[in-house]
Amino acid sequence: MNVTFDGIYNEIIENMHHFASEEKDFSKLTQYKDLISKTIDEVVEEVFNDIFSYEKTKTLFDESKRKELEEDFKNWIKGLFEISNDSDLNEFYKEIVKRGIKYVEKDFLPEYLTAIIIKIEDRLKNKLKEELKEDAQEIVDILDDLLKRVILLNVAAYMNFESKVLDYIGINQNLKKNAVKLGIKKMGL
């Protein structure tokens, strides 16, 4: 397979910079590290309890694998709020793309990550507004920008990698489109 991580990463970052606005100063979030960390722990635990209450996920993950994934996820998401310069940001973007690809292997779908991040964002916005009152809007905007980028990069990495792997094994775009069309027809949509 002639696909490299750097190739996938560069393609995704180029697209993100083309479609997204300029990054905000994410380092301002480090001032609220304790509040953010506590909120992340609470939300990730709640969401993992929800996700792992379904039979499908119970069959994919045993309890130890679930705890390992949960702790890894908490630690990683907290890293979002330790970005202090462009170099940190670039490394963090690479980590998001790597995780987007690795989660393909773990059956941890992008929609799980998206659900967790949206819930974290909602909870953090409320807590920041309680703590900062009228000064909260700038920080909430920065938080919103950062988390949207995480979701965008994660989904793009998952889809880009999956597409390249399927192309490599001979399942091209036309075959994928025809399979989707057949699925839509079978569902009567």
UniProtKB/Swiss-Prot annotation:
**Source superkingdom:** Archaea
List the InterPro entries. Globin-sensor_dom (IPR044398), Globin/Proto (IPR012292)
UniProt signal peptide: none
Any coiled-coil ranges, and where? none
Q: Which Pfam families does the entry mention?
A: Protoglobin
Q: Name one GO molecular function term.
A: oxygen binding
- What family does the Swiss-Prot or TrEMBL record give for this protein? To M.jannaschii MJ1461.
Q: Under which name does UniProt file this protein?
A: Uncharacterized protein MJ1356
Please tell me the species this chain comes from.
Methanocaldococcus jannaschii (strain ATCC 43067 / DSM 2661 / JAL-1 / JCM 10045 / NBRC 100440)
Q: What is the lineage of its organism?
A: Archaea, Methanobacteriati, Methanobacteriota, Methanomada group, Methanococci
